Amino acid sequence: GVFILVGLDGDHHVRKLFTELEETWQHTNRVRIVFGFNPKLAEQLFAAADFCIVPSYFEPCGLTQLYSLYFATIPIVRKTGGLNDTVFDLADATPTKPINGYTFLDADIEGVNWIVGRALAEFLTPSYKERQKNACKVDISWTNSTKAYLEVYKKITSF
């Protein structure tokens, strides 16, 4: 496999750790770290990737998983904020929507290792392909959200 990290981080210590990681694996040509953001590169990576890992501690909305779903790149996310509202997994007690990714609770290395292991074990199986099909069907347009907002506004303006 190939690991690519793209992101912005002002923390010098974190940048140094990822730079060292890339240097350590440089001879394999399988690790690439990109600091900064390039929309064209991001689109190409989403379209080419099999998985997108978003292990956020906090995520009020989350666009990364939405881009991922759009390109049928299976999101692997921590159940928090907007990630929890848009990515559904069989591991959820009662998934209300069709499964379209992998979710985990524990914000630690064990949690990430567990979910990545689970995702890799299912890679290219019927379960993985079902997630891809469901990912393509996710409606991320404003159509439904707009209708919901209009209903709220109607309720609060009619006394």
Language-model-derived ranges and their functions:
Residues 11, 83-84, 150:
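Positions that flank functional sites
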Residues 1, 73, 140:
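Short glycine/serine/threonine/alanine-rich loop segments
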Residues 39, 44-132, 136-137:
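Catalytic binding pocket for nucleotide-activated donors in carbohydrate/polymer assembly enzymes
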Residues 16-18, 89, 149:
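Short aromatic-enriched loop/helix-cap "lid" or pocket-rim segments at secondary-structure transitions
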Residues 142-159:
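C-terminal alpha-helical cap of glycosyltransferases
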Residues 12, 109-110, 143:
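Loop/helix-junction capping segments adjacent to catalytic residues or to phosphate/diphosphate-binding pockets
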Residues 3-44:
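Nucleotide-activated donor-binding/catalytic signature segment of Leloir-type glycosyltransferases, i.e.
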